[in-house]
């Protein structure tokens, strides 16, 4: 099922995000990575502070958002980094549990890939995907480039999207 049209796509450097929205983004990551997935490594690694890091999220309007004075509540989030070798890295992909299987993850990944192509058209895009999502990322054109490894107590696999490849597919939502 595609994400509703009322969803808003946002992107900004950390310094440009209002405190309430930043809190809601941190809470979403905490809920998914720490509470739900029981990740063993800290989420806050300092890379969000890099001015070149772009935080991206989808938000939905509603009464709760209005009561907090923000345009919408974040339902999906990720960050886009630039590696030392010029490659783009997408990470910290999180979708609120109540909004999974609604197309939000795929929509946000599509936006992130478009952003990567605009900002670094010749760069490859890298992800360290949770192993159970390997096929989901493969459906967007990512190729597995390494074996399983543990990160934060969760099985991951290194994947890459080569320049000029990949397009969001209509199959498989998260």
Residue spans for each PLM region:
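Short acidic/glycine-enriched loop/turn segments that link adjacent beta-strands
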Residues: 50-52, 85-86, 151-155
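Conserved beta-strand in the GNAT
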Residues: 57, 66-82, 86-94
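Conserved acetyl-CoA-binding loop-helix of GNAT-fold acetyltransferases
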Residues: 95, 101-114
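Conserved catalytic-core motifs of GNAT/GCN5-like acyltransferases
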Residues: 126-128, 138, 143-158
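Short strand-connecting beta-turns/loops that link adjacent beta-strands
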Residues: 49, 63, 83-86, 164
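Short amphipathic alpha-helix that is part of the acyltransferase structural core
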Residues: 2-51, 55, 59-73
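Conserved GNAT acetyl-CoA-binding A-motif
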Residues: 116-130
């Amino acid at each position: 099922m595609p994400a509703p049209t009322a969803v808003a796509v946002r992107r900004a450097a950390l310094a440009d995000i209002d405190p309430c929205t930043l809190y809601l983004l941190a809470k979403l990551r905490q809920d998914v990575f720490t509470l739900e997935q029981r990740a063993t490594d800290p989420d806050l690694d300092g890379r969000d502070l890099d001015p070149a890091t772009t935080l991206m999220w989808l938000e939905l309007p509603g009464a709760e958002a209005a009561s907090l004075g923000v345009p919408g509540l974040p339902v999906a989030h990720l960050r886009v980094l630039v590696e030392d070798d010029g490659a783009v890295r997408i990470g910290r992909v999180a979708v609120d549990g109540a909004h999974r299987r609604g197309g939000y993850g795929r929509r946000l990944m599509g936006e992130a890939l478009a952003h990567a192509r605009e900002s670094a058209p010749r760069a490859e895009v890298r992800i360290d995907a949770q192993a159970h999502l390997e096929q989901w990322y493969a459906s967007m054109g990512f190729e597995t480039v390494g074996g399983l490894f543990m990160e934060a107590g969760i099985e991951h696999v290194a994947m890459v999207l080569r320049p000029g490849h990949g397009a969001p597919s209509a199959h498989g939502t998260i």
